[in-house]
Amino acid sequence: MDKKMKSIYTLIAVAALFVFLFLLERTLPATSMLFTVLKKGAIYALVAVSLNLLNGFTGLFSLGQAGFMLIGAYTYAIFTIPPQARTQVYQYFDGGVIQFALPVPVALVLAGLAAALFAFLVGLPVLRLKGDYLAIATLGFAEIIRAIFQWDKLGPITNGSNLLRKFPTFSSVLFPFAVSGLCIALIVLLINSSFGRAFKAIREDEIAAEAMGINLFKHKILSFVISSFFAGVSGALLAMYQTTVQASAFKAAMTYEILLIVVIGGIGSVTGSCLSSFLFIACSEWWLRFLDAQTVINGFQVPFLRSGFRKVVFSVIIMCVVLFYRQGIMGDREISVDGLIRFIKKPFAKKAKTKGGAAHE
């Protein structure tokens, strides 16, 4: 199939998805848990793909994604709170320093740029480390930035340890899908470009990549900065979804969740990260919720079912996946337009072959 036909089929698939989501919003009540899964899943898909760009395609083991999401969330919130609401939000800091509000699209881009700037400054010394040392350094950065943003000395900007609120949010599931979809498409274009091939060469063998003329540090920091940019955008989307921002929400556990999503989906697979994001959110927010509720059947209380047991079961499931199916759902494969068309045509091809054989007899 040529590129033109692939593009046409891709556009048709995207249009069909958005029509389906539009009809879904008109059919189901706004409180349906399905919308929670779709909204949060779309946001986590973006941050998982951004982490996969580092871990899966460049071979850099980073654990700082929650820190960059925090920067993006705060940047978006700070620059979009309406001036008339700032006295309520910054009530302990005389209305704060910033007294203007940016449009939502501009603030989303600014959130990514702020995270990218921090990534560049942190990456200059940190990316000279490798393996576990890099992971520890980036995890340390995420924890430090979380503490700094809660510092009361920065209260006129960050509101200290208090909530940021009253900034623009979204209610439609179409918004996070549109923003995340656009960002993921840009990441895919990057992966398929000459820069993406350089990232993969670094992942496979740094010595061989350097021998081929690839500037290792330049491409590593480029991958780190771009990944952080999209993590910042996803942080802004998460702030819009949650309607409030507080630094204490961006703990190391958030990075571990994102890393698990990447591992479950398949390290080096964009579509794997997207699929596992929705599965992860569906399990943690919806399907396994009953495990947290105490259940009594005919006077007998079912053992273990109490608050927190859901996370235990979910952890066991993840351990089984990591131990017995290490490649994840997709491995390093992708769901392509060609593959989907072949999958759809397969039953019809078998039926036609059976009819042809019967006619020949």
Segments from the language model and where they lie:
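Transmembrane alpha-helices and adjacent helix-loop boundaries
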Residues: 1-361
